[in-house]
Amino acid sequence: MTDIESLCRLTEAVEAAGADIAPTYLEYVQLSFAIATDCGEAGRDFFHRLCRVSPKYQREHAERVFSNALHTQRGEVHLGTAFHLAEATGVSILSLIHI
């Protein structure tokens, strides 16, 4: 399974649960780096889909945060961080891993 396929499945599970997996600014930034590092530009829409459940979501701000993550490329944060954030909010990821 590719990183994009994994991210797609994670996004669908998070949306189905209605979970805010990045409620703090730190988690929000970590999520942007995790997706940007492993999925690049192809992850941008997924980042928006994962963030828009938050009452604090602002599309323009999310665009800037993700663009910054793409350009900065901090390689120490990977897609596993997104799965960890989802799991921490109660989203079941076991079925996603074994598919």
Residue ranges and their predicted role:
Residues 1-96:
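Modules that initiate DNA replication and primer synthesis
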